[in-house]
Amino acid sequence: AASMQKQYPGNIFDFSVRHMENSEAINPNDLADPDSLNRYVDGGGYGLSPLGYFMRGAGPVDESEMPFQNNIEAENKADLLIKPIAQVKEAEYMPHKETFLLPDTTDEFIAEAKYNIMKYGAAGCAYYSYDPLYNMDKNSFYNNQRGTYQNHAVTIIGWDDNFSADNFVAKPPADGAWIIQ
């Protein structure tokens, strides 16, 4: 999206999350399709699945083509045959860091993440989502537990270095937060 915004300044792009989600899932009615992935719409995914969606030319498609719906019913494959509005030709991959949000995360890695968000528009990451650590009033989450697995993927679209550490259930060592979608 960042590259498209540079090519088409002033345009606002709204890509269909529903199309990507369904393109990466299987429909029980399509079980004979050998190209289907082995998961359902509400069954989670893998960190690199969106990259595959873009690189194989399945998307992105405009939100107006397949608007968001809050349901878990998979679309039929025929409904997903929408012409993408752009072609992704390359992607940047940052090395996986287990310590991305832990107190000993290096300033160098945080600076690298911020640089990539500025350059490319966003960065994907995964974390361990655990409801008792979520502050619903401040819409904030911080997990200070080591050794937890990752069960949720998000896209980092920015940061706020002044977001108070007091806004979290588990208090981080300093102010600041990633802004995610």
Regions found by a protein language model. Give the residues of each.
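Alpha-helical support elements that line or immediately flank enzyme active sites
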Residues: 1-9
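Predominantly the structural core of cysteine protease catalytic domains
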Residues: 19-173, 181
